[in-house]
Amino acid sequence: MSNATVDDMDENLVGPVIRAGDLADAVIDAVIADNPGKEVHVIERGDYVRIHTDRDCRLTRASIEQALGRSFVLAAIEAEMSSFKGRMSSSDSEMRWYYKS
């Protein structure tokens, strides 16, 4: 995981922008677990946190439930997500942000 500045953001980085707090912390842990071998970029900006990986970022319900220690409806992230970078697809079990030229 790295802390970078917005100026350092590569145009190929994708992922959610989440309100800071316990859920954001759990999303960071889950994104790290769901994207093995990828560098996870975390940029804290006061009230929100940018969580990005290069070209493809996965977040599974199983990983976020493990990070939170309780069951969780994945769609509830959308209420806490002020924005995202890239394209997004979602299902009951996974959210994915990806880069497509």
From Swiss-Prot:
Source organism (scientific name): Xanthobacter autotrophicus (strain ATCC BAA-1158 / Py2)
UniProt keyword list: Cytoplasm, Plasmid
GO cellular component: cytoplasm
InterPro entries referenced in this protein's UniProt entry, alphabetically: MOase_MmoB_DmpM, mOase_MmoB_DmpM_sf
Induction: Induced during growth on aliphatic alkenes (such as propylene, ethylene and 1-butylene), epoxides (such as propylene oxide and 1,2-epoxybutane) and chlorinated alkenes and epoxides (such as vinyl chloride, cis- and trans-1,2-dichloroethylene, 1-chloropropylene, 1,3-dichloropropylene, epichlorohydrin, and epifluorohydrin). Repressed during growth on other carbon sources.
Highest rank taxon of the organism: Bacteria
Lineage start: Bacteria, Pseudomonadati, Pseudomonadota, Alphaproteobacteria, Hyphomicrobiales
Disulfide partners: none
Subunit (UniProt): Monomer. The alkene monooxygenase multicomponent enzyme system is composed of an electron transfer component and a monooxygenase component interacting with the effector protein XamoD. The electron transfer component is composed of a ferredoxin reductase (XamoF) and a ferredoxin (XamoC), and the monooxygenase component is formed by a heterohexamer (dimer of heterotrimers) of two alpha subunits (XamoA), two beta subunits (XamoE) and two gamma subunits (XamoB).
Localization, UniProt: Cytoplasm
Name this polypeptide is given: Alkene monooxygenase system, effector subunit
